[in-house]
UniProtKB/Swiss-Prot annotation:
Family the entry assigns: Belongs to the ammonium transporter (TC 2.A.49) family. Rh subfamily.
GO BP term (any one): ammonium transmembrane transport
GO molecular function: ammonium channel activity; carbon dioxide transmembrane transporter activity
Signal peptide: none
Record's keyword terms, sorted: Ammonia transport, Cell membrane, Glycoprotein, Membrane, Transmembrane, Transmembrane helix, Transport
This protein's name: Ammonium transporter Rh type C
Location of this chain's protein in the cell: Apical cell membrane
Top-rank taxon: Eukaryota
Length: 460
């Protein structure tokens, strides 16, 4: 089938309509929160909170910076491994994230910070909006190279909506703990994206197989994304934790899990190659799986050795997934997972949910202390009668809710994106920047390098 990929009207109209709608909605509903609005100074004085240094900005902004870099630089560059899709990997990630954070501020605001007729926005809202967009970036990895920017905007519109509903169910109704988003961000984002790409299955994708591979410099750019993600993941998992020991624990647990994951990923990558060589795909992706898997239990008393075990297991599972599971999914289940998000986010997200459920079930006053247990899991108010074993069951329920929302939502959104007027590329043109970008002319070299006798001058 021949597709019309000309976006001259479709993309501008879609972008402008969405942005104008957001401007109107922000004007009607969004206002600054107490820490950003001088009108609340009297209330602060009544609460003896008059020091500017007590403003939430100074507690949260460093973490916000780190998370923001992960979303726009980390995820963007991680997907530049495709040899002729670098512009689109970074550029489309930039586009969907910029739209997604605005839409997320509205939807999450209606669910979590709606007060006296307005959504109150502060720095913590910005972090949560980035988390929401992180889930979209995960799903983007599954459809990378096979969809148009208009399709990505439509997918973001629906996914942010579904994410916000799922997050509200888990955090507000089930009261689960998921500081680093193993369930809400990674599991939901991965299986949503995998379901969408399953619906959008392309039987003729083999025609673009040559462009689906990497070259030396594209892998190097992708490794930059990996390093940014790896360095800032402790901030990601601890960004919205309660101040004090919980936030401190989240950073330590993530740090340890990531470190262990690198060694096992390298070990497995070498062991699985017949000549003992390393595969850059494994090093770019599997080394991050420990950060995903420790997310749910990040605030809990997992202990540093427990975090090392989680990272150790995920390095093995993720690397094996890239070697064996990804080809199986494509050949048998018609799931064309471009970036292998099932191995980096899907399976590690499920492992993280299980680790969180088990760790919560095993919690006791000997480990946390009486007040510490109450504070760590919020066993007060209407949760006074909840026990650690009950909390573990709610944690497990949260995993199934996330999976159900991802699968059902992915099917619906996939069907919408399959409509023929979104400007998607033909099978033979997938993974190609030139379809949507003005490309610079590549200069023809006429210089002979004497040290290499095989080189010939370019044809005129």
């Amino acid at each position: 089938m021949v597709w019309n990929t000309n976006l001259r009207w479709r993309l501008p109209v879609t972008c402008l309509l969405l942005q104008v709608a957001l401007v109107v909605l922000f004007g009607v509903f969004v206002r600054y929160d107490m820490d950003a609005d001088p009108h609340w100074i009297d209330k602060k004085e009544a609460e003896n909170s008059t020091s500017d240094m007590e403003n939430e900005f100074y507690y949260r902004y460093p973490s916000f910076q780190d998370v923001h870099v992960m979303i726009f630089v980390g995820f963007g560059f991680l997907m530049t491994f495709l040899q002729r899709y670098g512009y689109s990997s970074v550029g489309f990630n930039f586009l969907l994230a910029a739209f997604g954070i605005q839409w997320a501020l509205l939807l999450q605001g209606w669910f979590h910070s709606y007060y006296r007729g307005y959504i109150r926005v502060g720095v913590e809202n910005l972090i949560n909006a980035d988390f929401c967009v992180g889930s979209v970036c995960v799903a983007f990895g599954a459809v990378l190279g096979k969809v148009s920017p208009v399709q990505l905007l439509i997918m973001t519109l629906f996914q942010v909506t579904l994410f916000s509903v799922n997050e509200f169910i888990l955090l507000n109704l089930l009261e689960v703990k998921d500081a680093g988003g193993s369930m809400t961000i990674h599991t939901f984002g991965a299986y949503f994206g995998l379901t969408v790409t399953w619906i959008l299955y392309r039987p003729g994708l083999h025609q673009s197989k040559e462009r689906q591979s990497s070259v030396y410099h594209s892998d190097l750019f992708a490794m930059i994304g990996t390093l940014f993600l790896w360095m800032y993941w402790p901030s990601f998992n601890s960004a919205v934790s309660n101040h004090g020991d919980a936030q401190h624990r989240a950073a330590i647990n993530t740090y340890c899990s990531l470190a262990a994951c690198v060694l096992t990923s390298v070990a497995l990558s070498s062991a699985l190659h017949k000549k003992g060589k390393l595969d850059m795909v494994h090093i770019q992706n599997a080394t991050l799986a420990g950060g995903v898997a420790v997310g749910t239990a990040a605030e809990m008393m997992l202990m540093p050795y427990g975090s090392l075990i989680v990272g150790f297991i995920c390095g093995i599972v993720s690397t094996l997934g890239f070697v064996y599971l990804t080809p199986f999914l494509e050949s048998r289940l018609r799931v064309q997972d471009t970036c292998g998000i099932h191995n980096l986010h899907g399976i590690p997200g499920i492992i993280g949910a299980i680790v969180g459920a088990v760790t919560a079930s095993c919690a006791n006053t000997d480990v946390y202390g009486v007040n510490g247990l109450t504070q760590a899991f919020g066993f007060d108010g209407f949760k006074t009668n909840r026990t650690p074993s009950m909390q573990g069951k709610f944690q497990a329920a949260g995993l199934f809710v996330s999976l159900a929302m991802a699968l059902v939502g992915g099917i619906i959104v996939g069907i919408i994106l399959k409509l023929p007027f979104w400007g998607q590329p033909a099978d033979e043109n997938c993974f190609e920047d030139a379809i949507y970008w003005e490309m610079p002319e590549e200069p023809k070299s006429t210089v002979l390098h004497p040290e290499d006798s095989t080189l010939k001058p370019s044809e005129p």
